[in-house]
């Protein structure tokens, strides 16, 4: 997505949420300065735009944001050999790994979307993404069918056994043997949610958070406008711009037009045939928007349309020929 200015061209389409949070409006300070922070995380960039309350320590808050993101990388990155995720991936058959709250929340959401999407989203494809060179390792050639079959046999969300947290007991995840997690289809969305939550707990009710293109809008700008973002359109495709008011709302994108993107259908182990070139999903949770955008981008576009409509998702799909489909939930926001 692209962070947009407040001015609205005549040809643009506008999508707005159904409700305005009256509490957020009541806490609005028209004199608050808008401050931008940014940094690096998860192999990409993060950016925060905040309406900074009087007396706030901007440097300390920015440091807290970076520390929060660094903590999630230490838990869930498949690029960091010392991360908890990598330790789980190489754990012994039948062993249980205790999950911190962030990791547990991501796994629970990932398993929910995996089930609801009939496996179109799968957090347990690390073996498959590895043989395709979508992780730290860079194979010299694409995998052959036998290699893909072996990776698929060692993968799959249905092999995961999650023991959820109870009173005074951490959640834990069983290693079924040789299974590798890859949370890249959901982690950036969760990170954006986590930063927005950190800011809210610090008394910042109005902020726009972006992590690698996944965005959360909390509250609104000091001038009373929402946080505007424009949904991206792949190069060479001409469509009327679609601008979204991110007020207590998040947006995530997926597609092969994104730099470095390479989507796999978890059910076949191959690049999906007939999938959308670009997918955008709006949701109150950026983590859920991220996971659903990943799911919709991994299947043929007709299946993605049916899935988005069935789940009531506010989604836009763009076909490779330039055709556009807006889900009923997104159309209702225009």
Name each region found by the language model.
Residues 1-334:
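Mature catalytic core of soluble alpha/beta enzymes
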């Amino acid at each position: 997505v692209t962070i947009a200015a407040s001015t609205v061209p005549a040809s643009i389409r506008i999508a707005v949420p159904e409700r305005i949070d009256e509490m957020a409006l009541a806490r609005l300070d028209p004199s608050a300065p808008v401050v931008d922070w940014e940094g690096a995380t998860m192999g990409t960039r993060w950016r925060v735009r905040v309406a900074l309350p009087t007396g706030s320590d901007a440097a300390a808050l920015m440091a807290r944001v970076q520390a929060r993101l660094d903590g999630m990388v230490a838990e869930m990155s498949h690029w960091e050999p010392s991360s908890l995720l990598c330790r789980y991936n190489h754990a012994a058959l039948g062993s249980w790994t205790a999950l911190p709250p962030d990791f547990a929340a991501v796994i629970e959401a990932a398993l929910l979307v995996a089930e609801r999407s009939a496996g179109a989203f799968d957090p347990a494809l690390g073996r498959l993404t590895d043989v395709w060179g979508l992780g730290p390792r860079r194979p010299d050639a694409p995998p052959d069918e036998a290699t893909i079959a072996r990776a698929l046999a060692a993968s799959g969300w249905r092999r995961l056994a999650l023991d959820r947290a109870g009173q005074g007991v951490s959640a834990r995840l069983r290693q079924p043997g040789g299974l590798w997690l890859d949370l890249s289809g959901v982690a950036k969305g969760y990170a954006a949610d986590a930063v927005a939550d950190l800011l809210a707990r610090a008394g910042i009710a109005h902020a726009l958070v972006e992590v690698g293109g996944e965005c959360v809008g909390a509250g609104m700008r000091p001038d009373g406008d929402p946080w505007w973002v424009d949904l991206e359109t792949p190069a060479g495709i001409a469509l009327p711009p679609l601008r979204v008011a991110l007020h207590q709302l998040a947006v995530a994108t997926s597609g092969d037009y994104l730099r470095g993107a390479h989507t796999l259908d978890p059910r076949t182990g191959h690049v999906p045939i007939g999938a959308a070139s670009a997918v955008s999903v709006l949701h109150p949770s950026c983590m859920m928007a991220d996971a659903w955008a990943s799911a919709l981008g991994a299947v043929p576009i007709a299946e993605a349309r049916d899935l988005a409509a069935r789940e009531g998702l506010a989604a836009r799909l763009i076909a490779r020929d330039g055709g556009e489909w807006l889900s009923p939930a997104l159309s209702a926001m225009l």
